[in-house]
Amino acid sequence: MRFVQGNIMPGKLVGSPKGAARTGTQAIAHAGDHSDLDEPKPKIAKSDPPSTAIPKKNNFKQREGTKNVKPPTLEEMKELRDTQNLFHSNLFKLQVKEMLEELQLKQKYTDFIENWLESFTAFTRQLKDGLMERTHLEVPMKLSEKPTGFVFSKPTREPYLIGAAATGTLLGPKIVVDVALEMPKESLHKEDYLNLRYDQKRALYLTYVTERMMESPDYAEDQFNFNYYANNPLKPVLELIPVTKQVNKHLQVRLFITAPLSSFKPGRFVPWNNNIRPSFYGDEWDEKDPLPSTQHYNANVLFDLTLSENQAQLDKAFKSRRNFQDGLLLLKVWLRQRQLDIGYSGFGAHILAAFIVYLNTQRILHQSSSSYQVARTVWNQLANTDWTKGISLSVAPIQTEELNKFAEHYDVCFIDFTGQHNLCANIPLYLYQRVREEAKLAVELLNDMKLNSFPLIFMQKCPLYSRVDNILKISNYSCINQMLTLHSHPRIKYDFANYGYPQLLHLLTELLKKGLAERVHSILPLETATAAWPVEKKAPVIGKYIQLGLILQPEHAYQVLNKGPAANDDHEGAEEFRRFWGEKSNLRRFQDGSITEAVVWGTAQDSPAKKRLIVRQIVLHLLEHHLQLDSKEVQYIGGELDQVYQLSPWFKVNKLKTKLPLGQDTDAEALSPHVIRCYDELARQLHGLNDLPLEIVSISGVSPIFRYCEPQPVLPQALLVENRILASSIQRVVIQLGQSGKWPTELGALRALKTAFLIEIGEKLEAQCRLHWVMSADGLLVLKQGYCFLIELAHNKELALLKQEVTERGITTYIDNAASRSLERQHYILPKVSGALHSLHQTYSAFGSTVLLAKRWLATQLLDDGLWPDMATELLVAHLFQQRYAPQSIAAPQTGFIRFLQLLSHSDFNGELFLLNFNNSWQEQQIADLEHNYRSNRQSYPPLAVATSYDMQHAGRLWTSDQSPSQRVLGHVTRLARHALEIIETSLMSKDLRFVRPAQLFRASNEGYDLVIQFKPDLVPNSLSYDLGSPFVSFSQPNFSLPRAGSDYIARIVGLLRSAYSDFAAFFYNPHGGKELGIVWRPPTEFAAKPFKVTELQACSPCGNKKVQVLKETLLEDFKLLLKDFYLRIATPEELKREQREHQKPMRYFDANKAEEESKPKPKKHRQRKGTGKKALPKRKRLIKSSTLKVLK
């Protein structure tokens, strides 16, 4: 169903594999024809007389081209059987097959790699032994002293391919070929295992080889850079980009320097040994104490020493096994899309390759397993195998005691073929658990028969930052040095060879894990790959910056209390609690009588947005209390975008007459429960009304606020003035009455009776409940506690009468039409969907606030309900929360908003039907039938198709239409979402930039509009939500006057403009208090002269030669006429920019004619000082009280 674009595939794999879809149809057709083709046909002997019997009609007519079709071969039958047994759909199998075909390396790259390796082998044979005295290159490592007297020994072994190039699993688009060059044993001495001597010699050896290569004419034009492998400063590698047309800079060669395993004594680098002495860093160590183990440094050296043996075993396992190679390719795509393989602590693809061999040796994977079986088995075993206890690939069996001893020194333990090196030495526990969770999710997606899981597993890019709820960034160099100096344990310093990053990671992870406890699910390092640098420059200092992502536990993250041990029962525990929390800890007495140490972070009455900052409070306090790190030196990202649905600071709450405890910092999310409680009380009063002709059996709130999806703050400020209710917003309520057979059968009479019934309800409410009410064209307006409710009456007979049509023959038929669909959606389907979304918010507390961010973003991009329906936004966000896109549910609205942008950016709207199966109301067959109908009749569905399980026969066509949103608007929104994601990702992953300000995302660009119509600001009330500014003009004095309830004049006028002039212009405005209307003209062909036709005269004017033409000037006059009193003036964006550049107040308050006169340049008048002949100095310009605002006086 869904083909989402990816960013890692070479070739044509950027969208839906059309070939796969066609192949799938053909394969299914062949599978269905096998039974007929296998049956032998009876032969008629020549001597037999012709049969006179009437032959039976063959319902399955044979095509002309299939008369000589051969029966399926054994291989085809096996493939069909595998499809039925392994894949839950033929489509999934075809998609996998198509992707693997696209991933296969082209022959030109294979040839180039072979030729380059031969050339490099010949080059190494020409190298000569010698003393390395001087070099014009910089050694890619921070050396303790300048290199003197390093003797270069010619390599005795030919260079060889390692990694993906050796196993045949290279993955684009940037093809990286890893080559190993073994440093001979003679280059190393007996004591080189100590104090980074081996690493320094390795770096010098790499520098020498690089210098000789640059002198060689074979590599003279190539580009040479150094880089750190896996962000490890002890692992410099040479990155060479060949300059040749054959590979066109799409290929890169990385040169690794290794050493033979026999270079040092066996057991020298076991995890419990020490190979970095404290004296190396100038530290003192008591000789009586055992030296601390340096397991991570030892594993770093063993990576080089065991590389040859490990690669030989991998080559043996993967050679000529296309199934293993393709399976590993699938796993690499899955891993890279989740960005779990980046950096020092990354889960590399070489680990997956070794795990495939491990499963094969354990007889869990077989040599005949398909690529899909390989990937699925690896995911299943990853999810269900615990590596923290240790697993081993060693050819020689390892005793359980020794394996346990290995595992004690690492978070994760996977022993290699030699039995000496831990492949997962640098992987922290939280990241390993994350890999397991992602693997478990992949298996669950594969097992879901209702879902096309292919795009979710392989095609959808899921960067790690979009999977976390909060992010902690520390980038101040001096602060990090201070933390490492004062708080990093010497044992950790020696273990990581004084590399700062893993020390920081260990220090912060342990502290936050203890402080946050059950509030946090995972603490993940967010890394970016280090950038390469020219070989002539010094190696950069890395590791002085860290970024951690926190995945929160929604059930516990926002608790306001940390309760410690009882002071009387556990004195030591209470003392430890006070020491850990510092001054925040206090002795408190609780309602159950217990007296314990406790830390309070807020109150139960705090708003949800404030509670979401509790984790932030805890983290900053821990950093300050334990690490002396000031909050100004830390960037904690979590809740920055909540500002966009806060109450405008221009509106003063203290002037509002209400009994509700409202603060100036309140927001739309915190105000929603007040409205819901008022609605619940109104519902009880309606149910309790006496003497009604019919009983009220159902009351449903259908406005967005009843499902926590209203982005504009709703305050209790509605008023009754001269029998009119003034309110900034109304809340819609639908009621249904008990059954009665006395309702009229004529539509007008039925609606009149409905009106009379609503008046009766209003009178009863006034008499029995003392509520004010006003009857309007849309329903009964009721004023209660400062809120305005619009009560509508639903009746089944009205819907039937709207569908009723009488044919020419007098036959009554019932046919759906736009009016009946609208009524059915509003009165019968929306109440059910609204209830389901309300329940979803109760399950996932971040749902409502995510919708608020999404709606505010779309509104600030000048997309109103006429271009993009609000319900479409709510249902798309609900789709995010319903589907298993990530192992954990979204706990922070900011994360939900980022995933919403990803959904808009990467979805194939033309190929996907967004299904919301509330309460599992749909059966599996119903979903399959709907998807089949969607695929076969795609043209009958709108561009954005969303279906819920309550839509009945309107599924996919009820919440959106062909024009809302149109294909163009969908493309526009997709581009906007991609741009917003680029801004967010750049700010998140940058070391220097701070997180985006809301105005960077929630303010539209002023580019691309032809004209801007400005409204009179005193007639257009401002939104109560936080004003982030207009894209066209600067801020102005806000207008919070209350309009007549339900009178959204601007929306109605824009609707009229679209209905009349959408063929000639597109209209954009911000529905949340926008005071400008952006206009984009259609292409010039719409305004070209055309022959006179009676049916095509709309907005046309005669232009001679019996032709007519649409004139933009005439259209503008029509626009002014429709806008009437709201129109102020029309300007181009360029004119508005020019006014702002000239530091003039944008002309929003005055008449356009006067504005034009005042905008003309006037000669400057200079005053003279009294008593002197000198001219007085001109007054300084004041922007607020400029001459252009005198019209207001």
UniProtKB/Swiss-Prot annotation:
Keyword Nucleus in record: yes
Annotated region (Disordered), positions in chain: 1-69, 1137-1193
Complex formation: Part of the small subunit (SSU) processome, composed of more than 70 proteins and the RNA chaperone small nucleolar RNA (snoRNA) U3.
InterPro entries: NOL6/Upt22 (IPR005554), Nrap_D1 (IPR035082), Nrap_D2 (IPR035367), Nrap_D3 (IPR035368), Nrap_D4 (IPR035369), Nrap_D5 (IPR035370), Nrap_D6 (IPR035371)
Organism: Drosophila melanogaster
UniProt protein name: Nucleolar protein 6
Family: Belongs to the NRAP family.
Basic and acidic residues biased stretches: 31-46, 1151-1161
Function recorded in the entry: Part of the small subunit (SSU) processome, first precursor of the small eukaryotic ribosomal subunit. During the assembly of the SSU processome in the nucleolus, many ribosome biogenesis factors, an RNA chaperone and ribosomal proteins associate with the nascent pre-rRNA and work in concert to generate RNA folding, modifications, rearrangements and cleavage as well as targeted degradation of pre-ribosomal RNA by the RNA exosome.
A single MF term (Gene Ontology): RNA binding
Biased composition (Basic residues): 1162-1184
Phylogenetic placement of the source organism: Eukaryota, Metazoa, Ecdysozoa, Arthropoda, Hexapoda
